[in-house]
């Protein structure tokens, strides 16, 4: 089976999986556990998330979100992670480049039967124009196509 790690992908047998064996055959989103350490703004905050293949695992290089019922739900989760509001809320709890589970404490759960946009989230939570402008001045758009941040 494939294992996603910091130096690329590797392969191991299922018997070598030590933790969270029950997640191996589920739909999951992998989020890099370390983001850019840059102090410049606007900032990316998190590395690019991706949907892991069923039957895969990851090293501690990633934080796992899930399991989810379908690949479509995973893609909707990624649309949420991609929003500036999501990453702004993470930034409030992320004093270093490490993005471990605790940095997601301020991020509210959503209905992942649909994709999310910042405009929808700003309206849902009643953010003012000033609040939106502040968030957008602090958080860089996340482009999920190719390359690094």
Predicted features, each with a name:
Residues 1-115, 120-126, 131-149:
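Polybasic, glycine- and aromatic-enriched phosphate-binding surface used to engage nucleic acids
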């Amino acid at each position: 089976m494939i294992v996603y790690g910091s130096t690329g992908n590797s392969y191991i047998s299922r018997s070598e999986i030590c933790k969270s064996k029950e997640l191996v055959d589920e739909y999951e989103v992998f989020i890099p556990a370390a983001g850019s350490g840059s102090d410049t703004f606007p900032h990316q905050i998190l590395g690019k998330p991706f949907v892991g293949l069923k039957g895969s695992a990851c090293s501690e290089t990633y934080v796992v979100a899930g399991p989810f019922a379908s690949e479509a739900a995973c893609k909707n989760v990624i649309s949420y992670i991609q929003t500036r509001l999501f990453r702004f809320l993470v930034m409030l709890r992320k004093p270093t480049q490490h993005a471990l589970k605790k940095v997601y404490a301020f991020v509210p759960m959503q209905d992942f039967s649909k994709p999310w946009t910042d405009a929808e989230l700003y309206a849902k939570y009643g953010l003012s124009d000033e609040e939106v402008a502040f968030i957008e001045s602090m958080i860089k758009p996340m482009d999920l196509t190719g390359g690094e941040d």
